[in-house]
Each structure stands twice: as C-alpha cells, then as structure tokens.
Amino acid sequence: MGHHITAINLKGNYDEKKAESFDLFGKELGFGLTLFHIDHYYSACWQYKLGTAGMIELFNINSSIFPCELALEELMKSISDKAEPQYAIIQTDYFGGLGEQYANVFKYKTNDNPRARTINEALYHLGVRTKSELDEFDMVGLGGIRSQPEFLEKYSDLADEYGV
C-alpha cells in the first residue's frame, strides 16, 4: 500500500476561518500540531496569488516537487496566533515500504534545524514525544493519512493557468 502526502504541520493555535480562506483545512494531530495538506502546485499558486517571490532555505531535500515557495512562510504567519510560527513541511512517497521522505522545520522564516532529515526528527523538534513502541510519525497518526485530498487537484490546472 502506498503512502504519499505533502503537508505543513503547524505548532500552536491558528485562525480556522483565515486558514480555510487559503484552502488550508486543518487536521489535529495532538501535541499542539495541526496538519494542512499542500503540494508544490498549491505553493506555486499561492506564491503567484500573494505576489511573493523567492524560495525558502531548505536542507537535505532531494525532491523536485517539495514545496519551497516563500508564500508558505507568509501563509503560516497569516493564520498562526504566533509572531514567529513554528512548522514543518513534510513529504512522503512510499509504496510497499520502499521510498523516500523529507522534512524541514521552521520558525517563521528561519530553517530551525538544518540537521533534521526525517519527519520523525522534525516532529520531535516540534515537541512530539513517544511513550510506547510507536515512533513520532505514528504517535501523531501520520501512518493513517496515506494520500492527498482531492481538493488539491485544482491547483495543477491553476498552476498551468497562472504559468507557474
């Protein structure tokens, strides 16, 4: 069975109505974290719509479709109740236990832990602690979130329309 998600995990409270105005529909993960599904088309489109330019500083990423537009920083700032929101951008691409995962963790505009390579390391940095044989990934239920929601499909067409 496959596992393919790309998302932002935001630490702390956020404005749900404002988030939804950006097509960010939160899923509570526990540990004060909320998951928002995104993808590279989503981030490119919001970069265009917000008029931002540039890329986030990423480390240890070997994926050409990992979202890295500066618009993501601005979206997190806009919906978070913190002046410098903490969040991780994560990505999985597995099938039958083989594949890749990537994660970077941020405090607003700063890559907060350039050594973080895995989703578990990013989640640990955001405060997830294990209490059993489960790792951080499974403690927050990411193992049960196996694919992207259908609403993101529109961003592929929008990216073409916007030329991004």
PLM regions with names:
Residues 1-30, 162:
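Short, extreme N-terminal segment that most often corresponds to the first beta-strand
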Residues 31, 37-164:
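Charged interaction segments
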